[in-house]
Amino acid sequence: FAKALAEVIKATPVVTTATDVNKLFAVDEWAARNNMIINSMKAAKDFAAALLDGQEVGLFTDYPIISALPRQIVLKDKGITGLAITKNRNVKPFDVTVQLWPRNIYLGIGCRRGTTLESIETLVLPKLKELGIDLRTIVGVASVDLKKDEAGLFDFVAKYNWEISFFTAE
């Protein structure tokens, strides 16, 4: 918030968190830069406290690692404190797990002509829950271009403020 406000009023933000002062990995800033949702700010604070205490913390990820890990963070799938970068909110490999959920999921939805918003929700929402997918990680919905006039589909997408894309059947 301080950085956004400073930009609006043309000021220099001064952010002094313990991780910043000690030049340690700041999970909240990293998540924001990478379009991820933090499941629990309490867990994020506990994670930062572990870093400040000099502890090694773990990283579990469903995604490839494409750069060097920050100091004190090691790749592992269990331990006391760590990050889990995953689309599945049920994955908690550490006693204190900071789940980072990338906003990168698109739903493919087909429906019969005249299908209502409520009917789509009745089918889609329980399936997402079963798969452990948080609604905040969904970016949009895709469907075949034959469905571009389906009010129920548009109502569903609008309700959750998602994008919608249509593709040809080819």
For each feature predicted by the language model, list its residue ranges:
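Short glycine/threonine-rich loop-to-helix capping motif typified by GTGT followed
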Residues: 146-160
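Solvent-exposed alpha-helices and their adjacent loops that cap or buttress functional pockets
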Residues: 6-8, 49-52, 74-78, 97-102, ...
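Phosphate/pyrophosphate-binding loops at sites that engage ATP/ADP/AMP, CoA/4′-phosphopantetheine
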Residues: 124-138
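Conserved anion/nucleotide-ligand pocket segment
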Residues: 1-67
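Glycine- and Gly-Pro-enriched alpha-helical subdomains that act as flexible
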Residues: 103-120, 124
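Conserved phosphate-binding/catalytic loops in two-lobed NTP-binding clefts
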Residues: 157-170
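Short internal beta-strands
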Residues: 137-145, 165-167
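C-terminal catalytic "cap/lid" subdomain
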Residues: 62-100
